[in-house]
Regions:
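Short, acidic, Ser/Thr-enriched surface-loop or helix-capping motifs
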Residues: 234
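Cleft-lining beta-strand/loop regions that shape enzyme active-site pockets
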Residues: 7-10, 18-24, 29-35, 42-210, ...
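Short acidic, Pro/Gly- and aromatic-enriched capping/linker segments at domain boundaries
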Residues: 221, 226-230
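Conserved functional hotspot residues or short segments at active or partner-binding sites
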Residues: 240, 258, 262-276
Length: 276
């Protein structure tokens, strides 16, 4: 983060971190009793990885300023990054957990399956998706949008690079995208592109606001320098970093509502209006 801390963007669904209750926005202060900051990110990541069955103790500062320690048992994480189903009113639902090496291919297969079932609309769930590979989100946006701007980057020399979709394929169904405070980076590229191109209604909470390309320059054994090399902008020129994507329909978290997903319920309500 800007103040040199290591922040949790969003724990991977089904991961040891999610299971013990680590949340988006939590600050990792220590690992196995040793203090860490963003300049020692690579070492921190190494400490958290390792053999299945090993224990690691993570010291967390949560959003309310409370310090907690969590003991995690390391386990392999091989998430299938895309899942889909048909929900009420014959609405197609696709959840993207993160953007990894085969996510765009998985998205295509899941959408083709839903299309065969003649769904009337599509809800894309990007909640708690921390991002991932930019080429994968560009591919998915290209599958969804007709010829349009997806995102552009601007570096310190004011050089812009534009990413656009072509006319080979597009999804013409009514669409709703679900986001929350754990939707970051590549998730914000996709939701921003669909919002600016008026291809989907965005429902949920303000997103995380991670819109920079960064690298760590190692400075010997004692630390490193975090370099921001470029920034992402939505097609309409909105800054993502530090701001996030503002939903068209705001719905607060469902955490305190027993067995009810109020954000998904609102997305379905919005979709019903679209497919009347």
């Amino acid at each position: 983060t800007e103040n040199n801390t290591i922040a949790v963007v969003s724990p991977i669904k089904g991961s040891p971190a999610e299971k013990v209750g680590i949340k988006s926005g939590d600050i990792i202060e220590s690992i196995n009793g040793k203090k860490y900051d963003a300049k020692h990110m690579e070492d921190a990541v190494k400490q958290m990885r390792g053999k299945a069955g090993e224990k690691v103790v993570i010291g967390i500062l949560d959003k309310n300023g409370k310090r907690k320690e969590y003991t995690l048992i390391k386990s392999p994480i091989h998430p299938q990054t895309v899942g889909s189903k048909v929900i009420e009113n014959n609405i197609g639902y696709i959840q993207i957990i993160s953007f990894e090496g085969k996510t765009a291919e998985e998205f295509r297969k899941n959408y083709e399956d839903l299309k065969k079932k003649n769904v009337k609309g599509l809800i894309i769930d990007l909640r708690s998706n921390p991002g991932g590979l930019v080429d994968q989100v560009i591919d998915i946006a290209d599958q969804i949008l007709p010829r349009a701007s997806i995102v552009y980057t601007n570096n310190k020399n004011d050089e812009k690079e534009y990413f656009n979709s072509d006319e080979k394929e597009s999804i013409t169904l009514p669409m709703v995208v679900l986001v929350n405070e754990g939707s970051a980076s590549a998730s914000e590229i996709l939701s921003g592109a669909l919002q600016d191109n008026k291809a989907a209604t965005i429902v949920g909470q303000q997103t995380y606001g991670k819109g920079v390309i960064q690298s760590v320059l190692q400075m010997g054994d004692d630390g490193g320098l975090i370099l921001t090399t470029a920034q992402y902008f939505t097609p309409n020129g909105h800054i993502v970093h530090g701001k996030g994507i503002t939903p068209d329909v705001k719905v607060e978290s469902s955490q305190n509502t027993k067995n009810k997903d109020v954000q998904l319920e609102k997305a379905i309500e919005v979709m019903k209006d679209k497919i009347k």
